[in-house]
Amino acid sequence: MVRVRFAPSPTGQLHIGGARTALFNYLFAKKHNGKFILRIEDTDLERSREEWAKAIMKSLKWLGIEWDEGPDIGGEFGPYFQSQRKDIYMEYINKLLEEGKAYYCFCSQEEIEKEREIAKQNKVSYKYSKKCRNISLEEAKRRIKNGEKAAVRIKAPQDGVTVVHDIIRGDVEFSNDQLDDFIILKSDGNPTYNFVCVVDDYFMKISHVIRAEEHLSNTPKQLIIYQALNLTPPQFAHVPMILAPDRSKLSKRHGATSVEEFFENGYLKEAIVNYLLLLGWSPGEDRTIIGLDEAIEKFELEKVSKNAAIYDVNKLTWINGHYLKEIHIEDLYERMKYFYSKKGIEIERFDKEYVKSALKLVREKVKTLVEVVDASTYFFDDSYEYDQKGVEKYLTPENLNIVKSLLDELKNLEPFSAPEIESLVRKKAESLNVKAANIIHTIRVCISGRTVTPGLFEMMEVLGKKEVVKRIERTCEKFLIK
């Protein structure tokens, strides 16, 4: 049975790279009717925080990536926090010590640093000198009993190669003489990342480890641990890195990089999932838009690229604009409540159909939910500021007097619909031998304070006759010299 896992460290928000890894695991599990497990790798006790674990889970759920086993729902192979599994790890570390496949290392940090410095001076890569490798277990235990601190190192093979069979990259060879007798238990009593990964993946019956390319260098060490414990390793697949447009490492200076930030910036979960799918994988046929259900059907690890994916926020924003136009208006209404409330606008106070009509208009010209708010505040608040350039260009006495002369006709217009309003405005322009655009732009500034809005006549229909007349009258009173 296919069993995959996403194992984030709770040291910050869910990064776009982590979200992509979680998504690929989720797709693979769903495609093969398998299980998707969430495991929290909180072995870094200094940096790990429970609130970050909760934030990561919240972001995954928001994206629609649900797990079958995990910290919050439990499962057959828990606990799902690594910090709660130390007894299991110690059992296997003791097994390796007893079998002579690992050993206690009493070298202090100062001694290790000295060795590093010598290697640096000799211009060779550092490898531990192995001076504790032949200390007997009995002697080591006696020294520990007498108060000495010790780490535990694995006895790694000293020649030959370790081969990683990678579904995406093929066979990747690592020379064993470069691998060193690496530490599996630190002197403070905490097991290391590579060791706990192996034990947990085995115990949780993980069939495929799908993770980021930066973990590829950890894989030979993990294979050595599997071999020492006589355990069968899972299959590995290392997905490509995500780089910034300049091919540097993606970081804060490139803008939003966490799922939480994308949410706050008004991106839709459907758009983010769609975009993440394209970072290293393609549905084929030169397509950009693909939903989760279709992706599950088409996803294959063998078709994931080896090459780094380039993060392009403009492409994400374009995709977001597509989904924003397609989303059901009821759904959009619900999602917009949060973003309007951040601006102090409670849309529940307004007639729901009125709000939905405003949203239908505005969403055609914007790309994010934040932009929806910014482009529509005048529908819900008539205390808007007037754009200064718009005032200077359009709110001239001549233009305002023309608009003012339209008021009686607007008041009597039935139905107060976009086609009827447009017909009235254009007839007025023709009768006065003025450009219709002048009247249109003047009314726009009068009723919104802006020079750029959705179509004026549709906007007037949504605002309604009473509100339009009130705003025009107020603007004329403010800017016409009495």
Swiss-Prot record:
Domain of life: Bacteria
Cellular compartments annotated: Cytoplasm
EC numbers: 6.1.1.17
Keywords, in A-Z order: Aminoacyl-tRNA synthetase, ATP-binding, Cytoplasm, Ligase, Nucleotide-binding, Protein biosynthesis
Molecular functions (GO terms): ATP binding; glutamate-tRNA ligase activity; tRNA binding; zinc ion binding
Binding, ATP: K252
Gene Ontology BP terms: glutamyl-tRNA aminoacylation
GO cellular component entries: cytosol
Keyword Aminoacyl-tRNA synthetase attached: yes
Keyword ATP-binding: yes
Main location: cytoplasm
SUPFAM superfamilies attached to this UniProt entry: An anticodon-binding domain of class I aminoacyl-tRNA synthetases, Nucleotidylyl transferase
Placement of sequence motif 'HIGH' region: 8-18
Subunit structure: Monomer.
Function: Catalyzes the attachment of glutamate to tRNA(Glu) in a two-step reaction: glutamate is first activated by ATP to form Glu-AMP and then transferred to the acceptor end of tRNA(Glu).
Protein name: Glutamate--tRNA ligase 2
Species per Swiss-Prot/TrEMBL record: Caldicellulosiruptor saccharolyticus (strain ATCC 43494 / DSM 8903 / Tp8T 6331)
